[in-house]
């Protein structure tokens, strides 16, 4: 009975809820709320499902990285592992980077030496450089497959030996594979690339050490052409293998000619090109690019160089070879060595290339600036060329297209420094922050030169507030200033009469490793001792001078020991006297005799003035004795002044009389 009643109630409730739902739906359709209006069947639009976009695994990281800017208070990204080991000087930074690179090379050696212990890949996404490389050939038989493997591994000597074995065995090697071998030999020469790179690193380190000492403003980055002076030997493996070809094609000639140009065999390259034409073959764009770059080496006069360039371009047109960006850059690079003729032809060449839809790259603009602005020469070119270049490149993000792209920013900043154009320097630096343009800064050496020129121009052209703003932004997060740069900063402080900042700058000098640079230290002392300031500034100067004294007394291993000069002793003493540090100044006066230095008469007169204010007659007489001991010509005048301005006892009068007689007899 109870169960039948409950079932009846449940059935009635369900029926009531259905009736209520139907009623509500009818009432909602009569209302004007758009959210509940049923769309018309005829007005339905077809839903188009967009195509799936595939994102790289680094896309999120790249998006996050684009939202932040460089933190001027943070260290370089390479130094984030251990903040306690962060270098504070340029030499420490170089040592740190080399040590870090040495550690990477050691790790890479063990990974490649014992690959079986590093088979599991933990990195997500995959990082190829953390996994073992295949450096040893797996195929030991004498076959084309084994030769192809050695070419891919860039084993120059092993590939040449295997090629000779194939020919001795009577096995013919395909022309394409032989051309691959020629490409390898002509690129690396007779040596394997690993050995070549090691030697290049050693020579690069030696060159940087020399240039760091001798060049700061006039320096340039070491180029590969300076480091690798491999010569093209006659009848080398490339020429021998090329001679064994029964019917060499254009690619064979291209490899040989490009190799000759790369290794400075320019005359042989043009001779080989003549052989190509005699065999009724057409050159490709790579051959013409190499020959255009070699023009300055085979023609001595400017007009002859330009005529040869025109002749090569005409031959390109006759052979229907379309030029590319590297063609433009090769022409501009050759025009850099054509003097005034190059300046007259540079813009027409760029205009002609633009007609062919060839847009200049950063390397093109770098060559253009080098054509119009000679490094180290008296600048007579109007700055509108620099302005036109910056108008073309401003706001653009560039991608690498030419190895010389990395030279643009250094060249542009050098031109800004030579022309004293601060506005364009700001534009160059602004361009550096657009997109991934920072990747074109090149090596650490190039980066240091770029910032050295930029900072030197700031010190020369801007007021000290702007200079200090950039100084705090750049140092030491991206730039370790040299002693010359710190000297420029001191001159900027002197120009704007902000010598009160010298104590802060001195602390930075010590931190940056310039505390033992005697010329720079003496410049700091001279500026502080030159004129008097308010008592607060004089107190800070005195503390700074006493701190500098410690640098003279410090004898740390591996650091240059500074020697006291008469001017440095006089400057420190003058600074202490100006701050009413008489006792400390008196101790400094004793150092003149200790280091065999002679104080100036002006310094002794300053001492007499301070002693007079304190009423210390004994010290005044002692000053006269010191002057007489050094046989200064001003001693008689000093005796007379003490006799007139001080109340002397009989003992003091007798001492001065004896000194006066000794001085007279000495004269």
From Swiss-Prot:
Signal sequence bounds: none
> What segment(s) does the record annotate as region Disordered?
199-226
For this entry, the transit peptide stretch runs 1-11
Question: One Pfam family of this protein, by short name?
Answer: Rib_mS39_PPR
UniProt keyword terms in alphabetical order: Mitochondrion, Repeat, Ribonucleoprotein, Ribosomal protein, RNA-binding, rRNA-binding, Transit peptide, Translation regulation
One annotated GO biological process? regulation of translation
Coiled-coil segments = none
Extract the GO molecular function terms from the UniProt entry. ribosomal small subunit binding; rRNA binding
Which spans of this chain does UniProt mark as PPR repeats?
249-283, 284-323, 324-360, 361-400, 482-516, 565-599
Primary subcellular site in the record, as a coarse category: mitochondrion
Q: Which domain of life is it from?
A: Eukaryota
Q: Which GO terms describe its cellular component?
A: mitochondrion; ribonucleoprotein complex; ribosome
Q: What does this protein do?
A: Mitochondrial RNA-binding protein that may have a role in mitochondrial translation.
Instruction: Give the family per the record.
Output: Belongs to the mitochondrion-specific ribosomal protein mS39 family.
Matching PANTHER family: PENTATRICOPEPTIDE REPEAT DOMAIN-CONTAINING PROTEIN 3, SMALL RIBOSOMAL SUBUNIT PROTEIN MS39
Name the UniProt record assigns to this protein: Small ribosomal subunit protein mS39
